[in-house]
Amino acid sequence: MTDWRIIAQHIAQTTGEAFNPQEPRTMGGGCINTGVRLGDGRRNYFVKMNRAALLDMFEAEADGLRALAQTRCLRIPQPLCSGLCNGESYLVMEFVEMGHSTRDGAALAGERLAAMHRFTQSEFGWIRDNTIGSTRQPNRLMTEWAPFWRENRLGFQLELAARNGYGGSLQHKGERLLEHFPVLLEHNPEASLLHGDLWGGNLAYDTTGQPVIFDPAVYYGDRETDLAMTELFGGFGRRFYDAYQAAWPLSPGYSTRKTL
């Protein structure tokens, strides 16, 4: 059973202010974590909890949230502290009261995502490995995009599938794809700062209509991967994509590359 006094004390130590929470309120934490709203009547925090062994997952998420927040392009829940409590790991972050998208909300999200993608570096990858969902995501830094995607994304996923007993035609097709991968990915993108897991469940709007992104799997990579992820499960709507294109048009061939 969670001892909320331990987490409250950690919050107080981090903020330098006393924090005596009321009864915690369970909220949606996704399909992986337990989510709890913890407040004292003045301040509210969102606490994500999971097994103790997954503390590193939360610490990597906090690093990613900070990196995204530094761009000041989209609203990001600010991480506060993380740790262990009675055999569980936790991550405490700013609680963002969610509302509904305004008429122009989707366009604003597209425009600001393009601005975030303008933050680049010379190498593809990230300062540490992290997770996408609860699956490990290797981020070894590399100077070229195609080898990075081949080894750290597609190749790693095929290897993971094989270790878990998945084979047959899908595995065979994947191996053939790896053999011809450089030919299929003949473009040299900049290494943009990416959310890394930007499907519809990880974008919302606060009470003022400002877009908020969360639950990242951050790394520097081809911005097209963020856009391709948004198209899963229904997409983000025409206003979003039109605004992104107006801010920073995608390179020719995206419609073919996005399937990878």
Regions found by a protein language model. Name each.
Residues 2-17, 120-193, 206, 246:
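An alpha-helical support segment within catalytic cores of ATP-dependent transferases
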Residues 18-25:
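Conserved N-terminal boundary motif of the eukaryotic protein kinase catalytic domain
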Residues 25-147:
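ATP-binding pocket architecture of kinase catalytic cores
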Residues 71-74, 101, 166, 236, ...:
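Alpha-helical structural elements of signaling/regulatory helical domains
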Residues 81-85, 253-256, 260:
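Short glycine/proline-enriched loop/turn "hinge" motifs that connect secondary-structure elements
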Residues 92, 194, 259:
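Conserved Rossmann-like nucleotide-binding pocket used by diverse enzymes
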Residues 138-141, 145-150, 159, 190-193, ...:
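Active-site Asp-x-Gly
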